[in-house]
């Protein structure tokens, strides 16, 4: 992708580069490209923190004083995904219009609103349901940003490094999911955060109430968000791309846009959907949400399965996103060497097998504590395998797109596919609520099989039309 002064006629100011050609090794500014990558990766991590902050809070809302039904909680956890999918359709067209600097800095500042709001509304747990829905929707800003940040970063790197650069940014950014889910249970119990506001009493089945400061799970991120916005405004540059909104929509006449969208729904749709619902699934299948296991709440709750140790979801939910994000980072360099299609194929086959295995753990056997514990282990390890293979696919599909499409279109396709896959938390939440857990997972197997066929026929087999 080459830009010329004519492409930047209307671009004035020190933030805009006069020309930029990452494919020309003699003029490519490697230092600027990597500086852009690391700053935007840090801010993208904060975006994922804000996006999945509700998923770390929602499973414990009833324990700190709210009284929502299971469907209400699933809808609440699904809403950030709905918002992210819709907002990604907006953010995908912003990079050529706003430029990297303004888009990244201003987007990062917007994260203050949902993060601050969730902190306030967990500090005093008396907000109406609609208000929490609004906050959940605003959290989707963090998810929407992905479709602007990733194409913008792709402008700075040559095609031969696209898999590594985008894999690092997306993978490290995805760590924001496990980061917020890991730190939340650890930070809320610290008395040192008394200055952040009043405490709450968290109820545990059959145990004494625990004093917590749940607002700390939100407030602790605000300084990092502000630092990210400052770094973006101070150090980022913008590549002048000659493409208006109408030009960007020419990607929809290319059939590979639609095939890659289907594949990315399998990979990132699964990663984001399960990241949002993992905690609730664990509670409702093997925890206090299952009336066949626990009756009542708090210290007076009655455990109906003698000897069963009810798992605390906050000890496990971060593992899935951590494994998925780690796989994305580790496999990105491999895709630069081998191409992405073969790994997308492996991802699809792996998802078929791991989803099938997990289905056996979706119907808890409450006949004994041993049977329940065995079912929980199968559920947990199956879910972690699903995260692993979705992470591999996230890396490989992002290698394929820059190989299949020319530079300007590749950015648009990355934004579009990311937008649709971001509906994962919404679709998973609604699908589980409407269909039930087991039928929804069966649909997941069917989808993965379809993706394996598409990948082999179109991208991976010898003589494939778009070998990638």
Residue spans for each PLM region:
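C-terminal transmembrane helical hairpin of 12-TM major facilitator-type secondary transporters
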Residues: 312, 318-321, 338-396
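Extracytoplasmic gate region of multi-pass secondary transporters
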Residues: 54-59, 181, 254-326
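Glycine-rich segments within core transmembrane alpha-helices of 12-TM secondary carriers
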Residues: 143, 163-192, 415-428
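Cytoplasmic membrane-interface "Motif A"-like loop-to-helix N-cap segments
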Residues: 96-108, 336-350
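Intracellular juxtamembrane helix-capping segments at the cytosolic ends
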Residues: 144-158, 391-406
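C-terminal membrane-cytosol helix-exit motif in multi-pass small-molecule transporters
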Residues: 189, 220-242, 451-459
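Central cavity-lining transmembrane alpha-helices of secondary-active solute carriers
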Residues: 75-93, 318-331
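Cytosolic juxtamembrane N-terminal segment immediately preceding the first transmembrane helix
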Residues: 1-49
């Amino acid at each position: 992708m080459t830009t010329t002064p004519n492409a930047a006629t209307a671009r004035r100011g020190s933030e805009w580069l006069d020309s930029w050609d990452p494919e020309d090794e003699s003029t490519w500014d490697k230092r600027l490209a990597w500086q852009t990558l690391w700053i935007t990766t840090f801010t993208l991590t904060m975006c994922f923190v804000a996006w999945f902050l509700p998923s770390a809070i929602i499973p414990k809302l009833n324990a700190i004083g709210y009284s929502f039904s299971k469907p209400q909680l699933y809808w609440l956890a699904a809403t950030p995904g709905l918002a992210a999918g819709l907002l990604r359709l907006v953010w995908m067209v912003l990079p050529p219009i706003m430029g990297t600097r303004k888009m990244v800095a201003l987007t990062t500042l917007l994260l203050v609103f949902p993060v601050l709001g969730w902190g306030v509304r967990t500090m005093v747990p008396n907000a109406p349901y609609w208000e929490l829905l609004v906050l959940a929707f605003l959290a989707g800003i963090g998810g929407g940003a992905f479709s602007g940040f990733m194409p913008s970063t792709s402008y700075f790197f040559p095609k031969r490094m696209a898999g590594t650069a985008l894999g690092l940014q997306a993978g490290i950014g995805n760590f924001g999911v496990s980061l917020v889910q890991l730190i939340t249970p650890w930070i809320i119990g610290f008395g040192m955060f008394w200055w952040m506001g009043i405490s709450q009493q968290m109820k545990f089945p059959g145990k004494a109430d625990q004093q917590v400061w749940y607002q700390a799970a939100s407030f602790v991120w605000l300084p990092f968000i502000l630092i990210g916005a400052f770094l973006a405004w101070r150090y980022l540059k913008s590549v002048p791309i000659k493409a208006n909104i109408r030009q960007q929509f020419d990607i929809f006449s290319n059939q590979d846009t639609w095939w890659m969208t289907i594949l990315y729904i399998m990979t990132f749709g699964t990663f984001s959907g399960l990241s949002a619902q993992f905690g609730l699934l664990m509670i409702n299948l093997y925890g206090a949400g299952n009336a066949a296991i626990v009756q009542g709440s708090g210290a007076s709750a009655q455990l109906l399965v003698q000897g069963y140790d009810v798992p605390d979801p906050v000890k496990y939910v971060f593992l899935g996103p951590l494994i998925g994000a780690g796989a994305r980072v580790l496999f990105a360099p491999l895709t630069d060497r081998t191409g992405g299609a073969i790994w997308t194929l492996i991802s699809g086959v792996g998802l078929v097998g791991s989803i099938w295995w997990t289905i056996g753990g979706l119907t808890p056997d409450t006949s004994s504590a041993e049977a329940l514990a065995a079912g929980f282990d199968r559920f947990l390890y199956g879910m972690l395998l699903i995260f692993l293979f979705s992470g591999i696919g996230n890396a490989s599909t992002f290698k394929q797109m820059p190989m299949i499409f020319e530079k300007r279109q590749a950015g648009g396709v990355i934004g579009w596919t990311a937008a649709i896959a971001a509906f994962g938390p919404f679709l998973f939440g609604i699908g589980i609520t409407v269909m039930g857990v087991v039928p929804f997972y069966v649909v997941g197997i069917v989808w993965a099989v379809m993706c394996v066929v598409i990948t082999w026929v179109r991208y991976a087999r010898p003589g494939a039309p778009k070998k990638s």
